[in-house]
Amino acid sequence: VLDLASFPDYQSVADRFHKSAVEPLSFEQGVYGLPETQTFPVLFYRKDILSALRLAIPRTWDDVIVMLPMLQKSKMSFGLPSAIATPTGGMNYKNLLLLLFQNGGELYTKDAKATLLDSPTAVDAFSFMTSLYTDYGLYKEYNFLNQFRAGSVPIGISDYSLYNQLSVFAPELEGIWDFTSVPGTVREDGTIDRTVPGEVNACMILSKSKQPEKAWEFVKWWTSAETQAKFGKE
């Protein structure tokens, strides 16, 4: 894969994007892709159902645990992204990363050549994540869109892109749902850390390309705000 930072105008192009979108595409001094999309999780909730149950929007994970008995008593649950697998067959690690980052942990060593998944912070995050399923009975796999619409999962975490799906496929819910930041972890100083992992899809250029300059021009055009806005509308 071609190092895009080798192009003279790379930095001016990279400035289009948030730093967090470029970071996963970088290694040492090289950058091997331009972000095409970036998503991150937020907390969706049904205002009508939470109001009927007299439940407040949870600010922390402790708040989530406190509200679970009331939800489950009404045959409802809090939704986390599926813990089973991704469409490509891999494990869904988003929940683990969310809890890891909120507790001050890191996924990789500073040189990015090894993971830190055996660190005490990572082990604690993994233990808490699994306890949400084993001890508190959250669904391991479910359809958030359908169950949020039906009301059996009136609150849960999903990528912000669910906003568009709900607007199109559940027009009857207009005005009775909303979204906010995910529940966070309380720091030692009393503040709440609501860090979430992002997911980036990117465009790359193969190092064996015979026309790297033309490929670079195409990638710049495709990832521009004007082109992406037009693509999204059409």
Give residue ranges: language-model regions.
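Hinge/lid segment of periplasmic solute-binding proteins
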Residues: 1-41, 65, 92-95, 174-183, ...
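Extracytoplasmic/periplasmic solute-binding protein
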Residues: 24-36, 41, 63-114, 153-155
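Short, well-ordered alpha-helical scaffold segment located
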Residues: 30, 48-49, 162, 226-227
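Short glycine- and hydrophobic/aromatic-rich loop-to-beta-strand nucleating segment
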Residues: 41-45, 100, 203-205
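Short helix-loop capping/hinge motifs at secondary-structure junctions, enriched
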Residues: 48-58, 106-107, 135, 208-215
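Short helices/loops that flank or line small-molecule/ion binding pockets
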Residues: 49-50, 66-71, 142-156
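Glycine-centered hinge/linker elements that transmit conformational signals in sensory
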Residues: 67-70, 111-140
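C-terminal lobe and pocket-closing loops
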Residues: 163-173, 183-234
